[in-house]
Amino acid sequence: MGNSMHSEPSPAIPGIGVHSGQVMTVLGPIPVEDLGVTLTHEHILSDVGCNGPEPPEASRKALFHKPLTMDILGEVRLLPQCNRDNQRLTDLDLVVSEVEKYCHWGGRTIVEMTLDGAGRVPLGLKMVSHRTDVQIVMGAGYYIEFSHPPHVRTMSADDIADEIVRDLTEGVPGTGVGAGIIGEIGIDMDFTAEEEKSLRGAARAARRTQVPMSIHVPGGSTRSHEYRTRIMDILEEEGASLEHVIMDHVQIHPTSMESQMAIAERGAFLGYDGISSGFDWGERGMGPGDEESAADIKHLIEAGYLHHILLSHDVHLKIMLTAYGGWGYAYILRQFVKRLRAHGVTDQDITTMLVENPKRLFSSRYQRGNGFGNP
């Protein structure tokens, strides 16, 4: 996998990366200044069956294969992976309706983290963007090993890097749709050799293109802090800049406040991307409620980490859509900002997290530095 240390980033590829002043969307590049209100971790069209394989028990198989209907919603909320249909976001008209609600509440951009092997549909995302006027930034790379297409096992880290660079610079083959972020690169409970290979390939692509990264770390694991530390060490070893990396799912137990601060101290962004999930993750542990997340965000702001916080919902299941009784993509704008204000978070702080920090993620022109200077 290589152990070389890179002290300097590669020269920028013209037109992309954090020095370009642009962000690639599924409809083409836009100025960073035009991002507007941005959710930095969502799924619009996806199929995350990798998170829930068919159960071995005959008694559970019927529920697993049943269409998601009102009579089983309660059961599915207790364990979202127990139903296969719940894990599919494939109805174009449905997701257009859901994304339109986000646009109605002032949302401008969504960073879409679905990857090859987990249901990425580049042309579908292009259609959603056309129909909703919401800017969509598509991801590149590979999620957790269980989702990897078979050919990934035969690839080297450099092969993976080349493929990601192609998606970023030329577009996904056969679609002409370009990716604008690397991720969400998946690390699961066991942090397998294949996942490390994928991570190193992604980091090398980030070094070559200077395009931001987003890294999935399993919530509910007692090893989350250990894994995040190891991930950041690998990224730095491969020459990726942590100042343009999101460490996802930091609010999910048992990630401590000390662990979150340690991530920010190394320069990375804190992905508060489970706002309003509203269900129990079963054996992986219960995510914090919005009240706890709001209090933690206020604590981080008071400790000086405002410019490291990004907000999102991580919508990836049908039960998270408003059509199935969920809160959808507009919940942060409709409700969670009120909870933040109740904790003393100012409107300027909210704008920083939803507008200015995404600009910092995608552009080196917006400085954090000592004291977190204003853009």
Region roles according to the model:
Residues G17-P29, Y331-P375:
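Mid-to-C-terminal alpha-helical segments outside catalytic/metal-binding sites
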Residues T40, L45, P56-T114, A118-T132, ...:
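Alpha-helical scaffold segments that flank or form the walls of functional sites
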Residues H41, I110, Y142, A206, ...:
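Divalent metal-coordination and catalytic microenvironments
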Residues H43-L45, L115-D116, G141-E145, E184-I187, ...:
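Active-site beta-loop-alpha junctions enriched in small/polar residues
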Residues E100-H104, L125-D133, D167-V177, R204-R207, ...:
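Acidic (Asp/Glu)-rich catalytic clusters
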Residues T109, M127, Q135-P212, F269, ...:
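Active-site gating/metal-coordination segments in enzymes
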Residues A203, R207-H299, I309:
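Catalytic pocket-lining loop regions of alpha/beta-barrel enzymes
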Residues H216, D273-I275, G304-G326:
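Short acidic/histidine-rich active-site segments
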